[in-house]
Amino acid sequence: MQYYWYPRARYNIDPGDRYNTAEVYVGVRYDQFTAKYSYALTNLFGMKTGTIGGYCGIGADGSAATTNCLGTGSSRGSGYLDLAGTLDVAVGVSLGLHYGRQYVRSYAPLSYADYKIGLTRPFGAVSLGAAVVGTDAESRFYRYTPTTAGSQETENVARLGFVLSASKTF
């Protein structure tokens, strides 16, 4: 079981509602491959009628969309499937693969698949990596408007990305 706790974080629309989420999960591992399924016992990050029901998203121009809006209801029972693997492709070089599928109950347009394909290589005590990450999430629901006063620009956080990393295990 895992619990996501966001102290003092609440929705502005319905201030009593929080983002906190409880999930139970089961996973299996075979050699270098893993599969895990997480099931939400609570509303997924607080999503329900009073917090996001009826929301239509943000258009590329920063204006509120008015069609194809979200439904209503509880998001309890949402789930996430996580498939991953690591393969040695050369001496000291590993290929990491990930595919995930988020299902959001009652709010199907928020459901998405995500993926990551990357290479890592240790250099002494540090591992360096490079990866391509992406998703098929509907951009109108995964945009944010910067907090700059008067700004109408939006950022699509559901687009293809490239990640460079450096990590050290203690």
Regions found by a protein language model. Name each.
Residues 1, 24-30, 81-87, 117-121, ...:
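Residues on the lipid-exposed face of transmembrane beta-strands in outer-membrane beta-barrel proteins
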Residues 3-15, 40-47, 100-108, 133-144:
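Sequence/structural signature of outer-membrane beta-barrel proteins
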Residues 11-13, 46-74, 139-157:
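Solvent-exposed loop segments that connect transmembrane elements
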Residues 17-37, 41-46, 50-62, 66-68, ...:
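Conserved anion-binding
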Residues 18-22, 29-31, 75-81, 111-115, ...:
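Residues that define the transmembrane beta-barrel architecture of outer-membrane proteins
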Residues 32-37, 43, 87, 91-97, ...:
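Repeated loop/turn-to-beta-strand initiation elements of outer-membrane beta-barrel proteins
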Residues 59-110:
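A mid-sequence, solvent-exposed acidic-amphipathic segment
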Residues 121-126, 154-170:
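Outer-membrane beta-barrel "beta-signal"
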